[in-house]
């Protein structure tokens, strides 16, 4: 959580008032739900501020809750998100399991320590995610991190999961930054060459769809938010859609209303599919 943490408040008086305000609150008497709700509220408020750019890492909680309720995860099963953002899918799945099942001691321990696994390559967002999970009683402050800082698309995860819930970052192409000979920063399209992918493409969303399929156990289930290009793009997109229909039970496509995301004009959908034996 504290990896590469920085203090960006330069005004000593302002920092003093902030510390004094935090210190005056009786945090010990608050339940985990209250602290977690306060933190979630701050994240959502920050996402609503379009100037902050945080909205791209924050999936609307009503959408997350609806997706989790459609998938209906069960106790003792694993849940992954290869683009974790601030951890919304993990929290919603946690709440669903606690509210809908009478969990015994072993199931509660599994839920806290072994259920969730994710990736988030943006360091600040990953830090927000880990704190969000900790405040909602998922994982430990000093234990092994449930959210890896590595790019999920570079290589197979090496693990398979019962459920994958994700809203991969929008923006059509994967890219990488580098410094050219003149010392200037440039970006270049990034193509992932993986033997377990059906097609090679620089389209980020199509790569996430392929990657998520490889993350599923034989009986695994997935729900993914995707933009329109995943449904309509030709070439590699057509190949991936055909393979998805042949190799999984793609049973539902949910069209989302415009305006549901903080980024303006985004047209998005949720695809639900169940893996099956080859």
Regions found by a protein language model. Name each.
Residues 1-75, 141-152, 255-259:
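Non-catalytic, mostly N-terminal accessory regions of nucleic-acid modification and defense proteins
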Residues 186-216:
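Glycine-rich S-adenosyl-L-methionine
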Residues 53-166, 171-175, 182-184, 206, ...:
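Conserved S-adenosyl-L-methionine
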Residues 179, 261-278:
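Flexible, glycine-/basic-rich loop-and-beta segments that form/coincide
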Residues 34, 59, 124, 204, ...:
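A generic structural signal for residues located within well-ordered alpha-helices
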Residues 208-211, 254-258, 268, 273:
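Glycine-rich, charged/polar anion/phosphate-binding loops
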Residues 216-222:
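Short glycine-dipeptide loop
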């Amino acid at each position: 959580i504290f990896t590469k943490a920085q203090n960006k408040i330069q005004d000593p008086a302002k920092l003093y008032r902030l510390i004094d305000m935090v210190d005056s609150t009786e945090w010990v008497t608050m339940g985990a739900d209250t602290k977690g709700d306060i933190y979630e509220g701050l994240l959502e408020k920050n996402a609503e501020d379009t100037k902050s750019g945080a909205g791209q890492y924050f999936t609307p909680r009503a959408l997350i809750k609806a997706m989790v309720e459609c998938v209906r995860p069960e106790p003792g099963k694993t849940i992954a998100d290869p683009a974790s953002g601030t951890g919304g899918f993990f929290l919603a799945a946690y709440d669903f399991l606690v509210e809908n099942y009478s969990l015994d001691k072993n199931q509660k321990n599994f839920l806290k320590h072994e259920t969730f696994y994710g990736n988030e390559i943006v360091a600040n967002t990953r830090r927000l995610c880990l704190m969000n999970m900790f405040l909602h009683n998922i994982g430990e402050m000093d234990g092994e991190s449930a959210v890896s800082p590595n790019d999920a698309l570079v290589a197979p995860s090496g693990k398979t999961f019962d459920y994958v819930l994700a809203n991969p970052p929008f923006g059509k192409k994967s890219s990488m930054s580098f410094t050219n000979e003149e010392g200037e920063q440039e970006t270049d399209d990034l193509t992932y060459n993986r033997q377990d992918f059906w097609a090679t493409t620089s389209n980020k969303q199509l790569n996430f769809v392929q990657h998520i399929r490889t993350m599923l156990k034989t009986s695994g289930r997935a729900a993914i938010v995707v933009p329109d290009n995943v449904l309509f793009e030709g070439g590699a997109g057509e190949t991936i859609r055909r393979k998805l229909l042949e190799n999984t039970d793609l049973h539902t496509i949910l069209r989302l209303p415009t305006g549901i995301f903080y980024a303006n004009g985004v047209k998005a959908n949720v695809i639900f599919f169940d893996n099956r034996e080859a």
